[in-house]
């Protein structure tokens, strides 16, 4: 499982798809999520605006499994 460090309270699922090079533009997120079974914390998710916070895990078919973490040097209350 790969870790994705974030410097904000959360990122959206659409942002994660771009960060992992799963899609080349944000406009592709809705299409990708309608065609592929992405899961967040083990549950199917098709909303590109889904907020991902530290400790969330995301499985993207063909790309891999990711865990959201607080970026090194950052500190904030994750929940």
PLM features: residue spans?
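Low-complexity, intrinsically disordered short peptide segments enriched in small/polar/basic residues
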Residues: 1-3, 35, 57
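A detector for short, charged/polar N-terminal pre-domain segments
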Residues: 1-11
């Amino acid at each position: 499982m790969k870790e994705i460090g974030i410097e904000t309270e959360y990122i959206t699922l659409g942002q994660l798809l771009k960060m992992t090079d799963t899609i080349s533009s944000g406009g592709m997120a809705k299409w990708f999520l309608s065609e592929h079974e992405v899961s967040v914390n083990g549950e199917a998710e098709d909303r590109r605006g889904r907020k991902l916070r530290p400790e969330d895990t995301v499985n993207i078919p063909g790309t891999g499994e990711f865990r959201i973490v607080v970026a090194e040097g950052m500190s904030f209350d994750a929940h």
